[in-house]
Amino acid sequence: GLTFTDCHMPQTEAADGATYTHHNMTQSPLENPAALEKCLTCHKSQGVEDADAMVTFVKGKMDELAQIQQATKTKLDEFHAKLAEVVAAGNADETKLQAAKDAYNLANVYFLYQGTAMRPTDGSMATMNFSKSVEQLQKADDAIAEGMAQIA
């Protein structure tokens, strides 16, 4: 697998032919020709032909993940609102209510973990591990469904 430095700090060739480590690690790899070349060492075998196609591929995955993230976020917000409504009504079965609260907390952890707490819905984690992010979102969705069933 790749590491942060493989993508954000690739080996770059200077004008004199010397190889050095690119140190602008805050730059998006999508804006760095050396980083895109590193991507293509694997992705060419998947039909991604050049740097422009690589950027299109990555942005497509980011958009796809952002849509899944936003759908989960909407469910999580609806679950939170339903929990608040049930608590305010004051007549819920305490065991079921606690199970629902626990499910909400678990779903929220999965949701925040998959995208980092700072950027949970922008799709940027697609480049790090798309399938793991989707897996975490599915776990969040499952916990939401289980919790909502407790207070339905």
Language-model segment annotations:
Residues 1-6, 10-151:
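Primarily the internal scaffold of c-type cytochrome electron-transfer domains
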